[in-house]
């Protein structure tokens, strides 16, 4: 099954933001008793619009993990050095490795 995840925030007549991703519902356990989401859309989330100070550490880790997955999936498909540099810049971790 494929679902759309579209969290958003809007202030009437001022601004709005929405992040949209397609997700595949997959088994999280061998017996299928728990489900999880696997991203199908591999596009970086624009980091310069994020207030990192408002995020919990686990939320920043999720974003860093998502960006690592985007980088790993998309980088082999790119041919130009300019595109590769853009992807590296836009998927770099927010958290320093511990």
Task: State where each predicted segment sits.
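Charged, cofactor-coupling segments
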Residues: 1-98
């Amino acid at each position: 099954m494929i679902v759309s995840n579209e969290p958003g925030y809007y202030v009437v007549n001022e601004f709005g933001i929405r992040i949209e991703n397609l997700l595949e519902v997959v088994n999280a356990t061998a017996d299928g008793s728990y489900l999880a989401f696997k991203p199908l859309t591999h596009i970086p989330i624009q980091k310069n619009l994020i207030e990192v100070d408002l995020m919990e550490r686990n939320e920043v880790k999720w974003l860093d993990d998502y960006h690592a997955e985007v980088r790993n999936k998309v980088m082999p498909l790119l041919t130009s050095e300019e595109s590769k540099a853009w992807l590296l810049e836009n998927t770099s971790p927010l958290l320093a490795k511990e």
